[in-house]
């Protein structure tokens, strides 16, 4: 893609945190998808966005080796870090100690069918206004069962007719807001200003974050503006063996 001046100046970097420990699908990053480890499939999708370097933040050496064998960049991180955000931050600080990359995109390592355009959208959104600290993505819920499913995180964003982005006011596993109108499925892909990410990981978990078990609430509890961009697709997250089969079919 041809980068705008503001995008080029921000020098975005995409970081994909990955670790072998997974309750429902152990060894998930190295799960085979048509002869390619899943983490490499995710790395390829991120490279296709064309916004800057893509770095895998690996908790274990076997993940880093798989990425490097495919021609990618990987940084080995502390396996005992408390969250993916901490892993992303440690990897960026080790890879780019000079601070050249001013925007950091956190892409989950279990999205092998990710549309690269979603990464571009997140970066464009965080750069849209100077007081946006980080951006994320939302998609309107159309399946009724998702509204009440606590595993589908809802974003509270007051979008007027025709608006394609807005300030996120809250995130919850509950069906919010009440009353007639759309509900939005939160997609856990983030573009941070680098200073925001550094501040975020230095803060303790908040009361609401611990209650909802949603890390992004730490940002809201500390008055960071999260801008949510509306997109029309939710990427498939691979959490189970059944999800893995779906991903293989989609990439077949």
From Swiss-Prot:
Pathway: Nucleotide-sugar biosynthesis; CMP-3-deoxy-D-manno-octulosonate biosynthesis; CMP-3-deoxy-D-manno-octulosonate from 3-deoxy-D-manno-octulosonate and CTP: step 1/1; Bacterial outer membrane biogenesis; lipopolysaccharide biosynthesis. CDD domains: CMP-KDO-Synthetase. It comes from the Bacteria. GO terms for biological process: CMP-keto-3-deoxy-D-manno-octulosonic acid biosynthetic process; lipopolysaccharide biosynthetic process. It catalyses: 3-deoxy-alpha-D-manno-oct-2-ulosonate + CTP = CMP-3-deoxy-beta-D-manno-octulosonate + diphosphate. GO terms for cellular component: cytosol. It is found in: Cytoplasm. GO terms for molecular function: 3-deoxy-manno-octulosonate cytidylyltransferase activity. Its EC number is 2.7.7.38. Keywords: Cytoplasm, Lipopolysaccharide biosynthesis, Nucleotidyltransferase, Transferase. HAMAP family: KdsB. PANTHER family: 3-DEOXY-MANNO-OCTULOSONATE CYTIDYLYLTRANSFERASE (PTHR42866), 3-DEOXY-MANNO-OCTULOSONATE CYTIDYLYLTRANSFERASE, MITOCHONDRIAL (PTHR42866:SF2). Activates KDO (a required 8-carbon sugar) for incorporation into bacterial lipopolysaccharide in Gram-negative bacteria. Belongs to the KdsB family. This is 3-deoxy-manno-octulosonate cytidylyltransferase. The gene is kdsB.
């Amino acid at each position: 893609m041809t980068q705008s001046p503001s995008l080029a100046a921000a020098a975005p970097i995409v970081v994909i945190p990955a670790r072998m420990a997974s309750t429902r699908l152990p060894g998930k990053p190295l799960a085979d998808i048509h002869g390619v480890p899943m983490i490499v499939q995710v790395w390829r999708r991120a490279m296709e966005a064309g916004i800057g370097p893509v770095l895998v933040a690996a908790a274990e050496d076997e993940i880093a080796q798989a990425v490097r064998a495919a021609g990618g960049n990987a940084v080995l991180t502390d396996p005992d870090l408390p969250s993916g955000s901490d892993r992303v931050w440690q990897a960026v600080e080790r890879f780019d100690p000079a601070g050249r990359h001013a925007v950091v995109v956190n892409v989950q390592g279990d999205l092998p069918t990710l549309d690269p355009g979603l990464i571009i959208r997140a970066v464009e959104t965080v750069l849209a206004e100077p007081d946006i600290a980080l951006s994320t993505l939302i998609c309107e819920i159309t399946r009724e069962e998702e509204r009440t499913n606590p595993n589908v995180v809802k974003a509270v964003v007051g979008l007027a007719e025709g608006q394609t982005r807005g300030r996120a006011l809250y995130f919850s596993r509950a069906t919010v807001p009440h009353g007639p109108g759309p509900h939005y499925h939160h997609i856990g892909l983030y573009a941070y200003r680098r200073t925001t990410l550094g501040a975020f990981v230095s803060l303790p978990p908040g009361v609401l974050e611990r209650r909802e078990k949603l890390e992004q609430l730490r940002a809201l509890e500390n008055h960071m503006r999260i801008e949510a961009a509306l997109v029309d697709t939710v990427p498939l997250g691979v959490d189970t063996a059944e999800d893995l089969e779906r991903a293989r079919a989609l990439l077949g």
